[in-house]
Amino acid sequence: MRLLTTVAALRCYLNKRRWESRLTASEEQILDSMTSWYQTAIGLVPTMGSLHQGHLSLIERARHENSTVIVSIFINPLQFGPNEDYGRYPRTLEQDRQLCEQGGVDAIFAPSPEELGIPQKNIQESQVTQVIPPSVMISGLCGHSRLGHFQGVATIVTKLLNLVQPDRAYFGQKDGQQLAVIKRLVADLDLPVEIVACPTVREASGLACSSRNQYLTAQEKQQAAVLYRGLLQAEAAFKAGVRYSSRLREVVRQELAKVSSVLVEYIELVEPTTLMPLDKIQEEGMLAIAARLGSTRLIDNTILRDRQPIIAIDGPAGAGKSTVARQVATKLGLVYLDTGAMYRAVTWLVLQQGIAIDDDCAIAELASKCKIELTPSQDLQSPVRVWINDTDVTQNIRTIEVTSQVSAIAAQAAVRQALVKQQQRWGKRGGLVAEGRDIGTHVFPDAEVKIFLTASVGERARRRQQDFQKQGQPEVSLEQLEKDIAERDWKDSTRKVSPLQKAADAVELQTDGLSISDVASQIVDYYQQRLSQW
């Protein structure tokens, strides 16, 4: 692991890593321009140091999803107010270095303020170029008392994203307002990075992990756990049918009042993406708290969603995801969202228009303009009819030609971005079953039920051969199918954009020797078990 303290060293290191990644690919992979660059995915975990279990969870996620993981450690003077704790904020670089090494981090970027051209002043006094988020997002919640804080956050995060140019950057849900601001920043500035939100990690008492927790005495830590208990009370009220902000906030306030040393700064209910105040939850809301305990300021939040559960089914090609998902949706009365069919439809259109598979720009143009519709069908074999640009392609997308090229098309960032937006729009109200390769990790990371279906290559090849025979497709040998499936597994697992991965909270089902009905029944049983716990 490298410790880098200058911009020059960081750029040199990143250039070297990208080049090394290309050189370590096999000759066959290098010749395939579509896959030779996948292994260079870079993940950035921005921190202010004083690392704790929450940071380690971000590092673990980044390590799982990228070939290179960079952790930045920079105590940003721009986000501290004149009377805040910049001077006494914990500085534990050697301890942080050890934790990063244990977590498999490739490099730490720990520059001084001078190296980044940041004066050790607050944002109001600084002459540095600033990034100003929308005022409506930074005037409420923490922004009300921490003037200039989010301008300072946005400025330094933009600088780090520009310096590292990561494929993914990881932030915790605990700082819900910060997360929303950064997502908006990336969207508005069209920055080519995926912002990955990770769940809040808590101590045994329920207290959200924070670098500032070390300011607390043992007794204060126990008292501070009342914030989480307040959120739990609100969650219980929400599940019981309470939807109005005033009532939910009062539930939290009553719980916090039990600890007199906790001084509430705010209890607010806002829309999680826009941060606009909510009077009533229609779809989802973020219930956020800020409070002081002694000289320590604490924040916490929870997301309350008024929707039916989502079942996310992931797994490699030929694992039976589509058939299983259709059966599960039918048994539970949920909508089946055939995401794979959407990628197949785009692939069919690319082939139909004679566009080269490696012509990323032409494919990006096509994917961003095409119109895909999924409609229910009475056909048990094809319960979803697929339309692209008003053409019914339900049968066309299942051909060998489309099957052999869909992974390469689906791996292209522009294609996935265009289709994921549509999928997430459909999933807003829940009540659906979706299958693919990154549903639980990328499309619906907050799905209530996550399943990872898998089977041996030989089993999947036999299933695929049987499918082709039923469809009247030309005969393909098992040996060739096994080779194709193994190659597809590699492409799907190593692509830079949303690779095939098992979500950390997914249940894995090995389906060799099991019938479709057996697998569907297991998922339905698990769904009902989970439902009884909500």
Swiss-Prot record:
Give GO cellular component annotations, separated by semicolons. cytosol
Q: Where is this region: Cytidylate kinase?
A: 303-534
Q: What residues does ATP bind to?
A: 48-55, 172-175, 201, 209-212
Q: Name one GO biological process term.
A: pyrimidine nucleotide metabolic process
Family matches, as CDD domains: CMPK, NK, PanC
Active site residues per record: 55
Could you tell me which residues belong to the region Pantoate--beta-alanine ligase? 1-302
Query: Which pathway, per its entry?
Result: Cofactor biosynthesis; (R)-pantothenate biosynthesis; (R)-pantothenate from (R)-pantoate and beta-alanine: step 1/1
Alphabetized Pfam families for the sequence: Cytidylate_kin (PF02224), Pantoate_ligase (PF02569)
State where the protein is found: Cytoplasm
Coarse class of the primary localization is cytoplasm
Q: Does the keyword Coiled coil apply?
A: no
Query: What domain of life?
Result: Bacteria
Keyword terms = ATP-binding, Cytoplasm, Kinase, Ligase, Multifunctional enzyme, Nucleotide-binding, Pantothenate biosynthesis, Transferase
- Where does this protein hold (R)-pantoate? 79, 178
Q: Which SUPFAM superfamilies match?
A: Nucleotidylyl transferase (SSF52374), P-loop containing nucleoside triphosphate hydrolases (SSF52540)
The reaction(s) this protein catalyses:
(R)-pantoate + beta-alanine + ATP = (R)-pantothenate + AMP + diphosphate + H(+); CMP + ATP = CDP + ADP; dCMP + ATP = dCDP + ADP
What's the Enzyme Commission number for this chain?
6.3.2.1, 2.7.4.25
* Residues engaged in binding beta-alanine: 79
Cytoplasm keyword on record: yes
Any one GO molecular function term: CMP kinase activity
Q: HAMAP family of this UniProt entry?
A: Cytidyl_kinase_type1 (MF_00238), PanC (MF_00158), PanCY (MF_01349)
In terms of NCBIfam families, this protein maps to: cmk, cyt_tran_rel, panC, PRK13477.1
Q: Which family does it belong to?
A: In the N-terminal section; belongs to the pantothenate synthetase family. In the C-terminal section; belongs to the cytidylate kinase family. Type 1 subfamily.
Biological role: Catalyzes the condensation of pantoate with beta-alanine in an ATP-dependent reaction via a pantoyl-adenylate intermediate.
- What is this protein's record name? Bifunctional pantoate ligase/cytidylate kinase
Gene encoding it?
Answer: panC/cmk
